[in-house]
Regions:
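Non-catalytic interaction/regulatory modules that flank or connect domains
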Residues: 226, 238-239, 245, 249-255, ...
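Histidine-centered catalytic micro-motifs
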Residues: 7-23, 115-129, 140-159
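Short Gly/Pro-enriched turn/cap motifs at secondary-structure boundaries
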Residues: 129-132, 138-139, 165
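Cytosolic juxtamembrane regulatory segments of multi-pass membrane proteins
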Residues: 1, 135-147, 206-211
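Non-catalytic, topology-defining segments of multipass membrane proteins
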Residues: 1-113, 158-239, 275-315
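Interhelical loop and helix-boundary elements at the membrane-water interface
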Residues: 61-70, 121-134
């Protein structure tokens, strides 16, 4: 489709999710419909402005190879083959170049751009209003399912966009087929309980504080001393402290939308500020997912990272 290499596209997509609706968002919908649809291709933001972890991409041999040879590969796939096949088959290279090459590329471009623009401009928001992302059925038709964008922004690691069985999400069905053919692995699917909880809380407009939201469904949580929490984290256990609670994120590290690096830096620390806007202002859905990983409550409420830094500076 000639929309950038895997590495380029994934980096911009991750930046969009991390900085959504802010000045660092590459497709910032708050700058207007034109900017989010086409303007960003003209007034491009350089990748150096972002703090986005792409170490997994840089260590993937397929991604590295495709990025290195992206231009000849894209020219061959987007123009070479569409021109050559009609030329060899029925002597119509002009029709192949125009319809299968140029026209197809224009349609594909605007179908994808519609997700950045119209799916942030018009539609329903069944999961959250914290971002401009919306579920737009028309965009879903055009972009083969990508229009269920409110769900995608709330649950960015889920391979689905249309979560209901009757949602028109061709991308989801193709990915499932690829899994059956063993061409796709490690598909992540958010549990129905977490999705229903997010939808229910949003409908009831109960934006509970982190401690209440996280502990409501867990009954008695065993206490732990701050030093013991730090010791366990330093010994290799994936523990993160947020608002006086400790979460075991060991099985979530490789699925963290912001990348492994930023989550690992939070281990053994008070990550309250990071979770609530310092690193990324996480959604209600993220809070619900986090609540399933609760393992301890810190005795006395824990440490505040800012005060901890001041103590170290004074020593």
């Amino acid at each position: 489709m000639r929309q950038g290499s895997i590495k380029w596209w994934a980096q911009w997509h991750r930046a969009h999710h991390r900085y959504v609706d802010t000045g660092l968002d590459p497709y910032n919908a708050r700058r207007g419909l034109f900017y989010s649809h086409l303007g960003w291709t003209i007034f491009r933001r350089h990748e150096r402005d972002w703090d986005v972890d792409i170490s997994d991409l840089e260590n993937d041999p397929v991604v590295v190879w495709q990025d290195r040879y992206y231009y000849p590969l894209s020219l061959l796939a987007c123009f070479g083959l569409p021109t050559m096949i009609p030329w060899l088959g029925w002597a119509d290279w002009r029709g192949g170049l125009y319809f299968a090459g140029l026209c197809r590329m224009v349609v594909a471009y605007h179908s994808t751009f519609a997700v950045n623009s119209f799916a942030h401009w018009s539609g329903s928001q069944p999961f959250s209003k914290t971002t401009t992302a919306r579920d737009n059925f028309i965009v879903g038709l055009i972009a083969l399912g990508e229009g269920y964008h409110n769900f995608h922004h709330e649950f960015p690691t889920d391979y689905r966009n249309g979560v209901r069985w009757y949602d028109l999400d061709v991308s989801k069905w193709v990915i499932l087929l690829l899994e059956q053919l063993q061409l796709a692995t490690n598909l992540h699917k958010v549990s129905d309980e977490v999705i229903d909880s997010c939808r229910r809380q949003y409908r009831q407009e109960k934006q509970l504080p982190p401690a209440d939201t996280f502990s409501a469904d867990h009954g008695e949580v065993p206490p732990i001393e701050w030093d013991e929490y730090v010791q366990q984290a330093e010994s290799g256990r994936g523990l993160v402290a947020i608002a006086g609670f400790v979460y075991d994120v060991s099985n979530f590290v490789d699925r963290h939308p912001g990348g492994e690096k930023i989550l690992k830096t939070a281990m053994g620390r008070d990550a309250t500020a990071m979770f609530h806007g310092g690193g990324h202002n996480h959604s209600l859905a993220a809070s619900n997912i986090l609540s399933t990983m609760l393992v301890y409550v810190i005795r006395g409420g824990g440490r505040v990272e800012l005060l901890n830094k001041k103590e170290k500076q004074s020593q």
